[in-house]
UniProtKB/Swiss-Prot annotation:
Belongs to the UPF0306 family. Gene3D superfamilies: Electron Transport, Fmn-binding Protein, Chain A (2.30.110.10). The gene is yhbP. Transmembrane segments: none annotated. NCBIfam families: PRK03467.1. This is UPF0306 protein YhbP. InterPro entries: Split_barrel_FMN-bd (IPR012349), UPF0306 (IPR011194). It comes from Salmonella paratyphi C (strain RKS4594). HAMAP family: UPF0306.
Length: 147
């Protein structure tokens, strides 16, 4: 199994992302439920334009973040660190993603918040189930590495 496939399978099983944005010398983090898109290597989420992180992001901004499970033992730790770009989706692109998002999270139907995409450009996946401290690396230009 290639690196991106392994990372993607794990991301598809999770549902909460933490991401951080930077604007004018200020950092801010947020959490949200996400939908993983393996084809585009992206996370989709809903967040209101009035939130601090959305206002700091504007229409598009660099982003970094994490996705991690909550294992009870060190040997089962798995998690992703990433960097990429967050952008607010509009029009038909937003509508199509919203439909898929609502299939995964039906409760979100009550949220009129816009859809955002986090395009993942670099991923580091720690997977202790493959051995303590095992890391898989992926870059958008398709160069994958193992450490």
């Amino acid at each position: 199994m290639d690196t991106l496939t392994a990372i993607g399978r794990w991301l598809a099983k999770q549902h909460v992302v933490t991401w951080c944005v930077h604007h004018e010398g200020e950092l801010w983090c947020a959490n949200a439920f996400y939908l993983f898109d393996a084809q585009n290597v992206a996370l989709y989420l809903l967040t209101d334009d009035k939130t601090r992180h959305a206002q700091m992001s504007g229409a598009c901004a660099p982003v970094a973040g994490t996705v991690n499970g909550q294992p009870k033992t060190v040997a089962r730790i798995r998690g992703v660190q990433f960097k990429g770009e967050i952008r607010r989706l509009e029009g038909q692109e937003s509508d199509a993603v919203r439909k898929a998002y609502l299939r995964r999270f039906p409760v979100a139907r009550v949220l009129p918040a816009p859809v955002w995409e986090i395009r993942l450009d670099e991923i580091k996946f720690t997977d202790n189930t493959l051995g303590f401290g095992k890391k898989l690396h992926w870059l958008r230009d398709s160069r994958a590495q193992q450490a």
